[in-house]
Swiss-Prot record:
HAMAP family xref list: UPF0282
Similarity comment: Belongs to the UPF0282 family.
InterPro entries tied to this protein: Metallo-B-lactamas (IPR001279), RibonucZ/Hydroxyglut_hydro (IPR036866), UPF0173_UPF0282_UlaG_hydrolase (IPR050114), UPF0282_hydrls (IPR014426)
Superkingdom, natural source: Archaea
Name of the protein in its database record: UPF0282 protein TON_1363
Length: 300
């Protein structure tokens, strides 16, 4: 099995897009890239916009190769919408290239879903139903792809129990020799998702950490995330790729150090430098205006 992390916060954008080739079947999970429209009261810096375009080109390249598409939920950093979006680098042609003629395994568009995601799911289905090979509402189901089992969790909270952000589904890919779980926006903050991961005993877990960058709005999430991740590490022995929300916090290396096994970011897994651009947006704007600011990565 070949696992290729495509785009994420450690690579400069909001995403957890991943390409998996298992027994010759090419699977694209959460094909979206985006930028936070406001951070520290600032719009994306020029460096972020450039990386967004680069990540979009990379994502489309892997979309052309992929045969199966999985969507965990309907936030725009996890799927590509059909509209022209500046901070999503989206368009109808990009979306068609990703979804046309392919089987889509997607989070249920009407059950266990909040109002915002329900609207987005409606728009997504309106555009994909005429062009997709087939569409499966995947929550809690398993599918045999011919030597590869694709298993989906029931809908679990996007973050902590009772989250207003809705629900997501996790994906297990098993080719008989390796088990990989992609668990996008669980944020390591709810028991249901932690217990499902432990029950499935993955060899590799690709997941996002808690949104500690939100400060008081995410109070207690640091400690809860550490506790839950350490439990998964102890109970499964899985290799962990940890990225997404936690990398929007400049203090994420300290979070990694508090874990019993230090995970890799997407960048670390690809053996390139972490470039958490959003976390350093204030500094990037200063540099782009000709000022000086310290950042822990190279800009090009």
């Amino acid at each position: 099995m070949r696992v290729i992390p495509l785009a994420s916060e450690s690579l400069g954008v909001r995403s957890l897009a991943t390409f998996v080739e298992a027994s010759g079947i090419k699977i694209l999970i959460d094909p979206g890239v985006a930028l936070g429209p406001k951070r520290y009261g600032l719009p994306p810096a020029k460096a972020e916009m450039e990386v967004l375009q680069k990540m979009r080109r990379k994502l489309q390249g892997y979309a052309r190769r992929s045969e199966v598409v999985v969507i965990s939920h309907y936030h725009y950093d996890h799927h590509t919408p059909f509209f022209e979006g500046l901070y999503e680098s989206s368009s109808e042609s990009y979306a068609r290239e990703i979804y046309e003629g392919k089987p889509l395994f997607i989070k249920h568009p009407r059950e266990n879903i909040n109002f915002s995601q329900r609207k987005r799911a409606w728009a997504f289905l309106k555009n994909t139903e005429p062009i997709a090979g087939k569409i499966e509402f995947a929550d809690g189901k398993s599918f045999d792809l011919g030597g590869v089992e694709l298993e989906f969790s029931p809908a679990v909270p996007h973050g902590s129990e009772g989250s207003r952000l809705g629900f997501v589904v996790m994906t297990l890919i098993d080719d008989g020799s390796k088990r990989v779980i992609h668990a996008s926006d669980i944020q390591m903050l709810n028991r249901k998702s932690v217990e499902w991961i432990i029950e499935k005993v993955p060899d590799l877990l690709i997941t996002g950490g808690p949104p500690t960058y939100l400060g008081k709005r995410a109070e207690g999430s640091w400690q809860a995330g550490i506790k839950n991740l350490n439990e998964i590490i102890r109970e499964t022995g899985a290799e962990i790729i940890l990225d997404h929300h936690i990398i929007r916090d400049k203090n994420y290396p300290r979070f990694f150090d508090e874990l019993e096994e230090i995970p890799k970011t997407f960048a670390g897994y690809l053996k390139v430098e972490d470039r958490p651009l959003e976390a350093y947006r204030r500094e990037l704007h200063k540099i782009e205006k000709g000022g000086e600011a310290e950042i822990p990565f190279k800009l090009s």
